Amino acid sequence: MTTAPTTTAATIAAGSVPAPAGPAGAVRLRSRLDRELPHRFARSAATPESSHLRTEDVAGWLDERRATHRFQVDRIPFAELDGWSFQQDTGNLVHRSGRFFTVEGLRVATTSGPYRQWHQPIIKQPEVGILGIVVKEFDGVLHLLMQAKMEPGNPNLLQISPTVQATRSNYTKAHRGADVRYLDYFTDRSRGRVLTDVLQSEHGAWFYRKSNRNMIVEALGEVPLHEDFRWLTLGQVGELLRRDNVINMDARTVLACAPFSDAEGVALHSDTELLSWFTSERARHDVEAELIPLNQVPGWRWGERSIDHEDGRYFSVVAASVQAGSREVSGWTQPLFEPKGLGMTAFLTRRIDGAPHLLAHARVEAGFKDTVELGPTVQYTPSNYAHLTERPLFLDTVLNADPSRIRYEAVHSEEGGRFLNAESRYLFVDADETDAPLQAPPGYLWVTPYQLTRLLRHNHYLNVQARTLLSCLTSGAVRL
């Protein structure tokens, strides 16, 4: 007698996904696409309130979680790091377990951009983590299970994060701490239906070839609710994205990968033209990025409390002591990168024959696995360019934009687990033919939001800054 295959945790752990079976074990084919899924997310984005937690009560819930747990971050000298040390031969900053991450040196040579050669510290974290959001329908509307999570680098410490935000070292408990809540929904296929699962890059200026799984899983059955978690509609998250420093970077990158409706169905450039242009951009840029010992990085000064560029630009490497009662481990020390100044990140937008378009930039960052990813029109930190005569294209259009042209503006922090007080001002700015012609300069192309979200079904097409801005579109925080 033939029996239908079953999905087990062991099967999934081995990397095998059984074929769906029909009666008497016959193989059953299914539709390759769930055409209803984008509409379900759109309905959630159009729902600004929930019976689980009113949007106006989110701030109070976050305050209550802050009061419940002890959160504190103090700068410390490198000598007070517990479990971290500078290797004697390389100077690399490493953890005694060999896990988590290391701070090493990077030598870069490129054929484009204002800098053609440079050296810098870089975070090497080869482990692939999980950034995952559990979703479930209540009263016909998808809700997202979001977490109030403390990260030491966040300016306000506590922000709203995905259901699961964990490195492999964390969820395999290299820190010997508590289990990661709700992890099984992302490691055991019997617990839910995968809606999105794709590798995406982290900050290419500060990470060396770092990727995380960005996942959305629809839960099967009841989901127990912990006090540090709440169900929110996508529309509620969109409203919170209009506020400064509420939704963290990891939540934003996952939300950008959510299925998105193609309302117009047309674009200035076909999908094939977009892919061909992007492939040519990757092919024409030569980037050599080589890891070197941290103690061989020229132009950087070592102190007891920080490693700084000799001109005071870019970022510093610092150390911190952390207390966080709600985390898997309640206290630890770690290195952090601290950028110099507030960044600015913006998409120029135009309606072309009625269809909204964004001006994407094929951006080179030394830490990318594939040299180039699509970024916003402008991605800029003023102090990094203060000494240069060359300024980013379209920068003045953004800086001098009339307030009536600014469709969206908010300050969001970057990855608070590795970066201290790293913030950027994110904008959508309307442009016209004078500001940004349809015939874009080399390295730029007009694309629709839907074309970008389609690319997010695949690895390493859009950088994390572009994904933050796309999350504002998928959630309804801004409508073009």
Predicted features, each with a name:
Residues 2-3, 12-52, 142-144, 152-285, ...:
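Mixed-charge (acidic/basic) macromolecular-recognition segments
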Residues 103-172, 317-386:
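Aromatic- and glycine-enriched beta-alpha-beta binding-site module
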Residues 67-75, 82, 97-102, 114, ...:
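Generic structural motif recognizing short loop/turn segments at the entrances and edges of beta-strands
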Residues 20-142, 151, 267-325, 329-331:
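An N-terminus-focused feature that recognizes amino-terminal "leader" regions
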